[in-house]
Regions:
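Amphipathic terminal alpha-helices
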Residues: 310-318, 322-345
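Terminal hydrophobic/aromatic helix or amphipathic segment near a protein terminus
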Residues: 256-303
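Alpha-helical substrate-binding/gating segment
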Residues: 196-204, 211-261
Length: 345
C-alpha cells in the first residue's frame, strides 16, 4: 500500500491522480480541517471519470506533527510519498514552518523506520541546494551553505532534507527530488498558479531574476519512476533535481501573457523600486492587519539569477521533460477554461 502526505496540495493532488489513474489504491493523509475539493478539481482537468479515480483514495485523518497518528496511518504501508510542507515567504511564518516541515518530516521518517516501510520519496526543493559563485549551473552536488539571505522556507527545506538523510543512515531506503519552480493548474489564489492569475489581472512589472521551472506532471511522473521496481535499487539514497529548463522571470511572464492573450508586463522593477515596495507593503500591513502582498523574501527570490541542471535524472533513467513552452500553454488553456466556466459564459 502507498501513503501520500500533502495530498491536497499541487504536487500531492497530481500525484494522487497519476497513481489512481494507473489503477492503484492509495492512502492519503489529511488533517481534519483539510479541504479535499481541490483534489477533485485537479482530477477534472485530466479526466471525466473523477469519481472513479477519487474513490480509490483512502483518506486517513492525521498530522505529521502527531507521531501516533502516523503510526496508525502507516499500517500496511510499504511506500511513502512525502509531499506535505508549508510554503511561505512571510517572515512571521518562519517558526511555524520550521516546526512543521522539519519536525513533521522527522516524525514521518521515524514512523517509516519503525513500521518497516520499504521505500520513501521525499519532495524537497531547489531551495535546499547551495548557490554557485560563478553563475554556473547548480547541481545535486552544490551543497547548501548558511547565509543571512536564506529564507525561512529554504531553511525548513534544508533541515527537512537532513531528516531524510538521517533516516537513510538509519537504514531507510529513500530517494529525494528537488524540483525547481513547479508549474501546474490548481488553486489560482496561491503558489505558482497565482502567477497566471496575476498576469490575467494585469501585472505590469517584471524582475531581473532567472530560475528553473518544471511541470508538475513531470514532477510526479519522475517520482513514480524513481520509486518503480525497475530502477529503485539504482537510484535509492540519492537526490535528483527536477528542472525542465531555466528562464528569466521576464520571459516566463511574457509567455504566460501570450498564452492568456493579455498584455506583457512592460515595466522593469529595479532593486530600488522593489525595496520601497516591500517596505511600503510592510507598513500598510501594520495598519490594516492584512498580510503584505510583497515581502523581503519574495523580493530577494525574484531578483536572484540561478541556473539549475536537471540532467542527472535524464542520464540515470532516461527521463524526458516536457518543454516549458508546452507546459505554459497547457496551464494557460486550463486557466482560461476555469475563468469562463464558473460564470457560464
Amino acid at each position: 500500500m502507498i501513503l501520500v502526505t500533502g495530498g491536497t496540495g499541487l504536487v500531492g493532488a497530481h500525484l494522487l491522480y497519476e497513481l489512481t489513474s494507473s489503477g492503484l489504491r492509495v492512502k492519503a493523509l489529511r488533517r481534519q480541517q483539510s479541504n479535499t475539493a481541490w483534489v477533485k478539481k485537479i482530477f477534472s482537468y485530466y479526466t471525466d471519470q473523477v469519481e472513479k479515480y477519487y474513490s480509490q483514495i483512502e483518506w486517513v485523518e492525521g498530522d505529521i506533527l502527531d507521531y501516533f497518528s502516523l503510526e496508525e496511518a502507516l499500517k500496511g504501508v510499504t511506500s511513502i510519498y512525502h509531499c506535505a510542507a508549508i510554503v511561505s515567504f512571510h517572515g512571521d511564518d518562519n517558526d511555524m514552518m520550521l516546526n512543521n516541515n522539519v519536525k513533521g518530516t522527522g516524525n514521518l521518517i521515524d514512523a517509516a523506520i519503525h513500521n518497516g516501510v520499504r521505500r520513501f520519496c521525499h519532495v524537497s526543493s531547489i531551495a535546499a541546494l547551495g548557490k554557485t559563485q560563478d553563475g554556473s549551473e547548480i547541481t545535486e552536488e552544490t551543497y547548501w551553505t548558511p547565509s543571512k539571505r536564506k529564507s525561512g522556507y529554504s531553511l525548513s527545506k534544508f533541515f527537512s532534507e537532513m531528516e531524510v538523510w538521517r533516516g537513510i543512515e538509519e537504514g531507510l531506503d529513500a530517494v529525494i527530488v528537488n524540483p525547481s519552480i513547479i508549474m501546474g493548474p490548481g488553486n489560482w489564489e496561491i503558489g505558482s498558479p497565482k502567477l497566471f492569475q496575476s498576469i490575467w489581472k494585469g501585472l505590469k512589472y517584471y524582475t531581473k531574476g532567472i530560475s528553473g521551472f518544471v511541470d508538475v506532471r513531470d514532477v510526479v511522473k519522475a517520482m513514480i519512476l524513481l520509486m518503480d521496481d525497475r530502477q529503485f535499487e539504482q537510484v535509492k539514497n540519492q537526490r535528483f533535481i527536477l528542472n525542465a529548463g531555466n528562464m528569466s522571470y521576464q520571459d516566463f511572464f511574457n509567455k504566460i501573457a501570450d498564452g492568456l492573450d493579455k498584455p506583457r508586463p512592460r515595466n522593469f522593477a529595479s532593486d530600488v523600486k522593489l525595496h520601497i515596495a516591500w517596505r511600503m507593503a510592510q507598513t500598510a500591513s501594520f495598519f490594516t492587519g492584512k498580510r503584505p502582498i510583497i515581502t523581503r523574501e519574495t523580493v530577494s527570490g525574484t531578483n536572484q539569477k540561478n541556473h539549475y541542471s536537471g540532467e542527472k535524472i535524464t542520464q540515470t533513467i532516461g527521463f524526458e521533460y516536457r518543454s516549458l513552452d508546452s507546459s505554459i500553454a497547457d496551464i494557460a488553456e486550463i486557466f482560461l477554461k476555469d475563468m469562463v466556466l464558473p460564470s457560464g459564459k
